[in-house]
Amino acid sequence: MPKMKTKSGAKKRFKPTASGFKHKHAFKSHILTKMTTKRKRQLRGTSLMHPSDVAKVERMLRVR
């Protein structure tokens, strides 16, 4: 039987680390004038995925 392919969209969006999966924040691409500076600053950078979503992403990436 052939190997299972990973979901290419998930492969581009999530990066596995020792403590979970890193991901970028949403809502930070365009039409940012109405957003406050504080909100834009909070959306900067990456964060770890919520534990309830980890199982779904592991299944998409065929990890563990």
Swiss-Prot record:
GO molecular function, one term: structural constituent of ribosome
InterPro entries xrefs: Ribosomal_bL35, Ribosomal_bL35-like, Ribosomal_bL35_CS, Ribosomal_bL35_sf
Keyword Chloroplast: no
Gene Ontology terms: biological process: translation
UniProt xrefs under PROSITE patterns: RIBOSOMAL_L35
Keyword Ubl conjugation appears in the UniProt entry: no
Highest rank taxon of the organism: Bacteria
Entry's Gene Ontology cellular component terms: cytosolic large ribosomal subunit
Keywords: Ribonucleoprotein, Ribosomal protein
UniProt-annotated stretches for the region Disordered: 1-27
Cited PANTHER family: 54S RIBOSOMAL PROTEIN BL35M, LARGE RIBOSOMAL SUBUNIT PROTEIN BL35M
NCBIfam families per the UniProt record, alphabetical: rpmI_bact (TIGR00001)
Family: Belongs to the bacterial ribosomal protein bL35 family.
Protein name: Large ribosomal subunit protein bL35
